[in-house]
């Protein structure tokens, strides 16, 4: 399911985005952010992070560097070692 959700993002990045001027206020771009968020966090959490990011991408937001949050590590696996 995750791979299927990434297909439209890839299509946008390689077929549509090059035809438009760069308008994203953030680094990485919103499409890169969405791809990475879904790839790292899964469809639900990554999708939610992407929607929140798109909601912040507007002319009144200064933008800047906004990386995808790191995947939380499990405390139980680190304590088992």
UniProtKB/Swiss-Prot annotation:
One of its GO terms (cellular component) is plasma membrane. It is a peripheral membrane protein. It comes from the Bacteria. Keywords: Cell inner membrane, Cell membrane, Membrane. It is found in: Cell inner membrane. Signal peptide: none annotated. InterPro entries: Membr_insert_effic_factor_YidD. Pfam families: YidD. SMART domains: Haemolytic. Could be involved in insertion of integral membrane proteins into the membrane. Belongs to the UPF0161 family. This is Putative membrane protein insertion efficiency factor. It comes from Pseudomonas syringae pv. syringae (strain B728a).
């Amino acid at each position: 399911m995750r791979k299927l959700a990434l297909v439209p993002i890839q299509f946008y990045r390689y077929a549509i985005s090059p035809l438009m001027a760069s308008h994203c206020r953030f680094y990485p771009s919103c499409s890169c952010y969405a791809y990475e968020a879904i790839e790292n966090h899964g469809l639900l959490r990554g999708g939610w992070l992407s929607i929140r990011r798109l909601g912040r991408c507007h002319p009144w937001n200064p933008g800047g560097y906004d990386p995808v949050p790191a995947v939380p590590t499990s405390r139980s696996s680190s304590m088992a070692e």
